[in-house]
UniProtKB/Swiss-Prot annotation:
Position(s), cross-link Glycyl lysine isopeptide (Lys-Gly) (interchain with G-Cter in ubiquitin): 314
Gene (UniProt): PRM5
Name of the protein in question: Pheromone-regulated membrane protein 5
Residues with Phosphoserine modification: 129, 279, 282, 288
Composition bias, Low complexity: 238-247
Keywords: Isopeptide bond, Membrane, Phosphoprotein, Transmembrane, Transmembrane helix, Ubl conjugation
Species of origin: Saccharomyces cerevisiae (strain Lalvin QA23)
Family to which this protein belongs: Belongs to the PRM5 family.
Length: 318
C-alpha cells in the first residue's frame, strides 16, 4: 500500500512516500514415524521501503503570475512585435510615396513654367513675356506683317539689297537691345553693376540714336499694320525718338564729343549703296507705303578732317 501526501504550494517540490511490504510464509512438515509426532509451523516477517520523486506543475488557480493561455494562439509575443514593426514600415513607405509624388509634381510645374518663359514661341516678339511693358506687349500682339505676295516684283531686288546692307552693318547690337527682357535702365554698360547711372543710360541711348542716324536703312522694318489699318512705329523708332529727346538738355555738346565716328564710315560700300538713286527711290516708296520714321543723317567732321580744313583755311560749322 502506497500513501502519497501532496502539500498545496505554488512551486513544484519533491515528495517522499513510504511503502511497507509484509510477507508471510508458513511451512509445515509432517514426518511419519513409526511413532506418531507433530511440529509447529514457522512464521517469518520482512519489511522494505523506497522513495520515488515526482514533479507536480503549479496550479493557475489563485496564482496571478501564471497567464491563462488557453484562449490565445501560440507565439502571441512574436505576432505583436511583428505587427508593430509592420505598421512602422508601412508609415515610412507611405510618407516616402507622398513626398516623392509632391516633389515630382513641383518639378514638372517648374519645368513647364520655364519652358513657357524661355521657349522661342513665348518671347517678347510674340507678346507673351511678363517682363515686357504692357503697351509694347499690346503693340506686338496687334501687329500683322505683310506677306511676301503683297510685295511687288520691283521691290524684291531692293529688299535683297536692304538685306545685304543690314548684314554688312552688323545687326547684332540692335538685336541684343531688342531681345533683352529687362527695363531700359539696365543697359549693356551697367547691367553687371548694382549701381544704375542715369547719365550712363542717356549716353547709351544717345549712342544708339547716332548709330541709327548713320544707318537709316536699318531703321526700315517691314510695314506693320494694326487691326485698325493704321501703321505703327517700330521699337527702333520709339527708342530713337526717346533718345533724341534726351539730347535737348545741356549735355548735348558733351555727349556729341563722345560718340564721334571715324571718317571711313562715310566711304564704306554700304554708305554708297544707301546714298545711290535707287536706294533713295526705295526709301521714298517705303515712306509712302508705311510712313516709317527715317532719321536724317547729321554727322560732325572727324578731328583729322577738321584740322585739314582748318589748315586749308576753310571754315567749318559746328
Amino acid at each position: 500500500m502506497t500513501v502519497i501526501t501532496i502539500a498545496k504550494r505554488g512551486l513544484p517540490k519533491l515528495t517522499t512516500s513510504t511503502s511497507s511490504t509484509t510477507t508471510a510464509s508458513s511451512s509445515s512438515t509432517i514426518t511419519s514415524v513409526x511413532s506418531s509426532s507433530s511440529s509447529l509451523p514457522l512464521l517469518s516477517n520482512s519489511t522494505s521501503s523506497s522513495i520515488i520523486p515526482s514533479i507536480t506543475p503549479p496550479s493557475r488557480n489563485g496564482n496571478p503570475y501564471i497567464l491563462d493561455s488557453g484562449d490565445m494562439p501560440n507565439g502571441t509575443v512574436f505576432i505583436v512585435v511583428g505587427g508593430i514593426a509592420g505598421v512602422i514600415f508601412l508609415a515610412i513607405l507611405l510618407w516616402w510615396v507622398i513626398t516623392t509624388y509632391s516633389s515630382h509634381r513641383l518639378t514638372r510645374s517648374v519645368q513647364d513654367y520655364e519652358s513657357k518663359m524661355f521657349s522661342x514661341q513665348h518671347t517678347q516678339f510674340y507678346g507673351d513675356s511678363p517682363y515686357m511693358d504692357y503697351p509694347a506687349k499690346e503693340n506686338f500682339q496687334d501687329q500683322v506683317h505683310i506677306s511676301e505676295s503683297d510685295i511687288s516684283p520691283g521691290n524684291k531686288d531692293e529688299s535683297v539689297k536692304d538685306a545685304l546692307v543690314s548684314h554688312t552693318n552688323n545687326e547684332k547690337p540692335f538685336l541684343s537691345n531688342f531681345e533683352r527682357p529687362l527695363s531700359s535702365l539696365v543697359s549693356e554698360s551697367n547691367r553687371n553693376s548694382l549701381f544704375i547711372s542715369p547719365t550712363g543710360d542717356i549716353l547709351y541711348k544717345t549712342r544708339l540714336s547716332k548709330l541709327y542716324q548713320e544707318s537709316p536703312r536699318l531703321l526700315q522694318k517691314p510695314v506693320i499694320m494694326t487691326s485698325d489699318n493704321v501703321s505703327t512705329n517700330s521699337l527702333v523708332s520709339t527708342i530713337s525718338s526717346s533718345s533724341a529727346s534726351s539730347l535737348d538738355n545741356g549735355n548735348e555738346k558733351e555727349v556729341g564729343e563722345d560718340i564721334r565716328k571715324p571718317a571711313k564710315i562715310a566711304s564704306s560700300p554700304s554708305r554708297k549703296l544707301l546714298n545711290s538713286p535707287e536706294s533713295d527711290g526705295s526709301v521714298n516708296r517705303n515712306h509712302s507705303k508705311g510712313n516709317l520714321l527715317v532719321v536724317q543723317s547729321k554727322r560732325k567732321p572727324t578731328p583729322s578732317t577738321y584740322l585739314e580744313h582748318m589748315l586749308e583755311g576753310k571754315e567749318q560749322d559746328e
